[in-house]
Amino acid sequence: PAKTVVPVELTRTVPSRPGVEEHVRVSIGRVGDKLVATPLGRGAGNITTVTRAQGDVRIPEQAEGLNEHAVVPAELSVSEAELDRILVCVGSHDNTLDLLADELMGLPEPSRFASTHVGSMGGITALKNGSCHLSGMHLFDPGSDDFNFPFIKKFLPDVDVTVINLAIRHQGIIVPHGNPMNIQGIDDFTRVRFINRQRGAGTRILLDWKLKQAGLKPSDVKGYDKEEFTHMAVAVNVLTGAADCGMGIYAAAKALGLDFVPLALERYDLVIPTRFLDDPRVQAVRALLDSPAFKARIEAQGGYDTPLTGQIMAEGEKRM
């Protein structure tokens, strides 16, 4: 039988080489009255993408890829009803989101968690466009000494959102085991090879603020322009020796047996359009965040505290 073709909005840009027609597997979820597609990894080795994908999108051979927010046709590999079980998260990357995905799939009424890592500011754009059910965010505003709310007020004045804490994270400098270069703080970044996070990432915003505090400019840091999209990717750069250090969370350093120099505690929140609070998929997330067993899983990663996990946050209420 012919497969169903539906219009979908892409959550991020998909680059492609002109001259070759490509098929990209996507995870598709229904957000309000539109279908939103998250591009998954490519290549024959990506067995997991087959199980995670709900369809695929064709990139014509004359195109140099497809842009973020573009609406394109997707061929479904599942029934359209299946798309109502996908929870779309767009924003900052955190390892806890993988735990959340795992737990949601194990529920009697499973939901699939489709997460796109575009940084906290990318999450704000997705919320503004109505392209996600929730967004992970950890944007620190030095002016108000508050997280996330100053940015929500500035960029999402017309979107009614509810902010729920996921965890408090330990951010710092990821260094090789034994810290051979004796990196103790931001001042040391002038003498080492650094690996940065992408523009718009909360970690990058924190770094820029710390550099300013130390009286340093981005140009003083060798590798400031080298970017990765996740904490784990930064940690891999340090592990392989491609960089001497990078900013990231303790859990990423611990996962790869690296050392960690703590710099800051930060509040990592889930920002949810209030209209989705009654959605069964979102309610399943909230129930997990309230469960002691899930909080224990978060803390077992290392570098996470859960005193606020599952609680609704209010402006100016840092509570850390």
Question: Which residues are covered by each model-predicted region?
Answer:
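Short helix-initiation/N-cap motifs at beta->coil->alpha
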Residues: 115-125, 219-236
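Flexible glycine/proline-rich
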Residues: 1-84
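Periplasmic-binding protein-like
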Residues: 158-161, 165-170, 258-287, 308-313
